[in-house]
């Protein structure tokens, strides 16, 4: 039966906490029950039978039941894990495509983390360099691990390169993008990354490791360093870019002023630019990174 096989799928994955696994098992039992209630023969289904129509039916049921957006998003994450485990990630569309509303929480408190007081010399050099790339270019964790300097430079020399290119297969939602090179520290980190990639076979992942095994090690190391999932490095990049482009600090790091009409227009333009550099496509998400002048 589908519910039993889904529970077994969870048991086969031993890289996550017991709490996460238990929560996922409970959700999978619910999914199987709801699919059966909606006419699917779960006795003949296996986890590999997951299709878009099953996802759509579950989503339809949750909306009918008045389930909160937060809970729906958690359930969608479980469905994406299922799809990934059976190598059928296309079965579950993005939240945007499924019209699951976005929530943006603005606190005007900085969530940035800095590498300045962290000793990276004692950890794996590949992980250390990925962290520096995240810090310098605002990369996501996966992007920093899969980063291939030769591809990213797009035929440019490091000394006079104007931008880097991120391959769609490295990125969230397969949205490739370019990020400008605006300071010498970025060039310094590109040189280090380039030299390391030569040893690794192209990326920041050791050639003897798969992405999955390297990611597991990466998570253990960053947890021990106290930087969590490293998302705070992207916050730091966004805040530094805002200062660089606007000439004064953003609200999240204590910026306080009454913007002129010209500054309001420039603020909007720069927030959209930073949003694109971070791999987003909407301006309101930047309030999470930069804060909001309206909350001052």
Where are these regions (language model features)?
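Conserved tyrosine-mediated DNA breakage-rejoining catalytic core shared by Y-recombinases
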Residues: 146-190
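N-terminal core-binding DNA-recognition domain of tyrosine recombinases/integrases
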Residues: 7-103
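Catalytic phosphate/metal-binding cores of nucleic-acid and nucleotide-processing enzymes, i.e., regions
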Residues: 45, 176, 209-216, 262, ...
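DNA breakage-rejoining catalytic core of tyrosine-based enzymes
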Residues: 100-120, 173-185
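Alpha-helix N-cap/helix-start motif at helix boundaries, enriched for small hydrophobics
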Residues: 79, 142-148
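C-terminal catalytic core of tyrosine-transesterase DNA break-rejoin enzymes
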Residues: 236-280, 295
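Active-site/catalytic core of tyrosine-dependent DNA strand-transfer enzymes
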Residues: 182-246
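Basic, Lys/Arg- and aromatic-enriched nucleic-acid-binding interface segment
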Residues: 114-142, 265-271
């Amino acid at each position: 039966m589908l519910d039993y096989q889904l529970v077994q799928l969870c048991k086969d994955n031993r890289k996550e906490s017991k709490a996460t696994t238990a929560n996922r098992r409970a959700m999978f039992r619910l999914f199987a029950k709801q699919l059966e209630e909606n006419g699917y023969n779960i006795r003949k289904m296996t986890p590999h039978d997951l299709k878009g129509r099953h996802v759509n039916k579950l989503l339809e049921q949750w909306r009918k039941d008045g389930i909160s957006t937060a809970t729906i998003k958690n359930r969608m994450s479980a469905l994406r894990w299922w799809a990934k485990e059976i190598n059928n990630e296309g079965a579950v569309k993005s939240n945007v495509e499924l019209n699951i509303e976005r929530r943006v929480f603005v606190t005007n408190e900085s969530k940035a983390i800095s590498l300045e007081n962290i000793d990276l010399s004692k950890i794996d050099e590949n992980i250390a360099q990925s962290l520096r790339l995240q810090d310098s270019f605002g990369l996501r964790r996966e992007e920093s691990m899969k980063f291939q300097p030769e591809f990213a430079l797009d035929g440019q020399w490091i000394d006079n390169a104007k931008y880097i290119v991120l391959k769609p297969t490295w990125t969230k939602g397969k949205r490739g993008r370019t990020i400008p090179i605006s300071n010498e520290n970025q060039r310094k980190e590109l040189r280090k990354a380039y030299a390391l990639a030569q040893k690794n076979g192209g990326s920041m992942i050791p050639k003897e490791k798969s992405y999955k095994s390297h990611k597991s090690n990466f998570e253990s190391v960053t947890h021990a360093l106290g930087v969590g999932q490293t998302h705070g490095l992207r916050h730091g990049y966004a805040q530094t870019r805002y200062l660089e482009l606007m000439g004064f600090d953003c609200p999240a790091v204590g910026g306080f002023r009454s913007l002129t009409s010209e500054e309001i227009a420039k603020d909007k333009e720069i927030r959209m630019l930073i949003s694109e550099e971070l791999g987003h496509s909407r301006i309101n998400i930047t309030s999470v990174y930069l804060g909001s002048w309206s909350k001052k």
